[in-house]
Amino acid sequence: MNAHPRTFEAKPAIRESVPLLIGLMGPSGSGKTFSALRLATGIQQVTGGDIYGIDTEARRMLHYADHFKFKHVQFDAPFGSLDYLAALQQCVKAGAGVVVVDSMSHEHEGPGGMIDLQDKELDRLAGNDWAKRERVKMLAWQKPKANRRALINGLLQLNANFVFCFRAKNTVKPVKVNGKTEIVPQGFMPIAGDEFLFEQTVNCLLLPNSGGVPTWQSENVG
């Protein structure tokens, strides 16, 4: 046992400026990039610092260069968790007050992302032995999950505001109704890991043809 118990000090609570983590999710064409840059501009007016845009979408963020002032960071594959962390850290070190990431979904299912890394780990551990691959499936998640945890922990140490864009897909589920199988809509599901979404200060969904106006209706979210 510890012979010297830890001591803790309580002070009056004072509101401080806490960095924002904002998640914008939606299908293609829902206005994620424009909305993210508009949000970033509003945040910058309060907190200062430069706006940095990390672009994994083949330079598409540059379409809005005439509308918003920001520094563009081209981010190509691989899209590993630690690659994202390095990009975020470099932006903050360079003076970013707000960082827009479009798209964060590549960290989950893009080349070099979490799902891709788990598949590579399966190849390393079991090769083409399909029975063994099934046995070590959970073990193969250890490295991808550790890398994502490192991303999250590192992100939370950065003194800047972040706006993350997530792709979303419309999901369905087969359901038995009166002995027949019917396809029931389940809403939009963001392409991202739950543990990353949980860290956001706020998440909102941009529906198609919404003009960038978010919806908070739970039935629209898978």
Predicted regions and their residues:
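Glycine-rich, phosphate-binding/catalytic loops in enzymes
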Residues: F70, I115-K120, K180-T181
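Structural motif
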Residues: V98-V100, V163-F164
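Conserved P-loop NTPase nucleotide-binding/switch module
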Residues: V101-W141
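Conserved P-loop
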Residues: N2-T7, P12-A94, V98, S105-H106, ...
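Phosphate-binding/switch region of NTP-binding enzymes
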Residues: P27, A146-G222
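Short amphipathic alpha-helical segments
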Residues: A65-D66, G112-G113, V175-V177
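Conserved nucleotide-binding/hydrolysis micro-motifs of P-loop NTPases
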Residues: E57-M61, M104-E107, M114, A168-K173, ...
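A conditional alpha-helix N-cap/helix-loop micro-motif detector
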Residues: G80-S81, W141-K145
